[in-house]
């Protein structure tokens, strides 16, 4: 990354000769321009001859001229290292080991390795991003397919299944023991509708009751088969008929008693 950072500044800053800086140190030399060739080119990479960024001050007073400033830099013991204060010569113009020019940095094996590592890291990140994007797309495709399959299902299938479940009555054990037919049930309370007997059935039952008020189980089964009725219906009809007969006889006896008490010979 260090070589990449240095190489990015090579084409950004032009040579300092094209951009001279005015000297604002002395009021007598306000119109003069400073010679940029006297700057220390060995301090900068890529042969940059721009502004002198030395920060040594010999006196806290007013600003000094260029000659006095260079003299104070040479005389002061706390100034920067010697190689920054030497005049421009062939030896000083040569770049040091820590400030290499752009060409040497570009051709160095360290820079090539760093560039390769950077390219590998970028390619790996791009590959991982593409893989993750592909997985997201595949998941979205699966979800879309599932949603389309759900939409293609006919809406009446779920309703018919729910209707079949609701229509089938739940049969409990006590209902089976009582032999209750669910077709004859009417209303939430489970009351049976009143049985409507035909004229023929009523006449046959009245005839049988006239001869015998109480039926045996065998005779009750025979009458049920003959009249196409259930054994329970025959039993209930005979019970109701006996209650009616008792009521009629009671009224008849009461009337006869009243008539006998009123009749005096």
From Swiss-Prot:
Where, by residue number, is the motif Antp-type hexapeptide?
171-176
**InterPro entries recorded for this chain?**
Antp_homeobox (IPR050296), HD (IPR001356), HD_metazoa (IPR020479), Homeobox_antennapedia (IPR017995), Homeobox_Antennapedia_CS (IPR001827), Homeobox_CS (IPR017970), Homeodomain-like_sf (IPR009057)
| DNA-binding region(s) from the entry | 190-249
Keywords from the UniProt entry? Developmental protein, DNA-binding, Homeobox, Nucleus, Transcription, Transcription regulation
Please list where the region (Disordered) is annotated. Answer: 59-108, 144-165
| Any Pfam family matching the protein | Homeodomain
Name a GO molecular-function annotation. DNA-binding transcription factor activity, RNA polymerase II-specific
Where composition is biased (Polar residues), the residues are 67-79, 86-95
Where would you find the membrane-spanning parts of this chain?
A: none
Q: Kindly report the protein's main subcellular placement as a broad class.
A: nucleus
Going by the entry's taxonomy, the superkingdom of the source organism is recorded as: Eukaryota
Give the GO terms filed under biological process for this record: anterior/posterior pattern specification; regulation of transcription by RNA polymerase II
Its protein name is Homeobox protein Hox-A5a
Organism from which the protein derives: Danio rerio
């Amino acid at each position: 990354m260090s070589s990449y950072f240095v190489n990015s500044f090579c084409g950004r800053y032009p040579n300092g000769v094209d951009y001279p800086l005015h000297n604002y140190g002395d009021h007598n030399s306000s119109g003069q321009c400073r010679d940029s060739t006297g700057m220390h080119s060995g301090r900068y990479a890529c042969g940059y001859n721009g502004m002198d960024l030395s920060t040594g001050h010999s006196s806290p007073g007013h600003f000094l001229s260029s000659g006095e400033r260079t003299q104070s830099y040479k005389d002061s013991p706390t100034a920067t290292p010697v190689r920054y204060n030497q005049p421009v010569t062939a030896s000083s113009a040569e770049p040091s080991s820590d400030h290499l020019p752009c060409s040497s940095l570009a051709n160095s094996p360290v820079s090539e390795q760093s560039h390769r590592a950077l390219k590998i890291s970028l390619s790996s990140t791009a590959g991982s991003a593409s893989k993750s994007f592909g997985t997201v797309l595949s998941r979205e495709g699966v979800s879309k397919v599932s949603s389309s399959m759900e939409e293609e299902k006919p809406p009446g299938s779920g309703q018919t299944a729910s209707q079949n479940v609701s229509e089938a009555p739940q049969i409990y054990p006590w209902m089976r023991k009582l032999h209750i037919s669910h077709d004859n049930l009417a209303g939430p309370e489970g009351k049976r509708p009143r049985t409507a007997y035909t004229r023929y059935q009523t006449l046959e039952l009245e005839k049988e009751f006239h001869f015998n008020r109480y039926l045996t189980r065998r005779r009750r089964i025979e009458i049920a088969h003959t009249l196409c009725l259930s054994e329970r219906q025959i039993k209930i009809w005979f019970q109701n008929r006996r209650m009616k007969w008792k009521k009629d006889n009671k009224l008849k006896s009461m009337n006869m008693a009243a008539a006998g008490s009123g009749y005096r010979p």
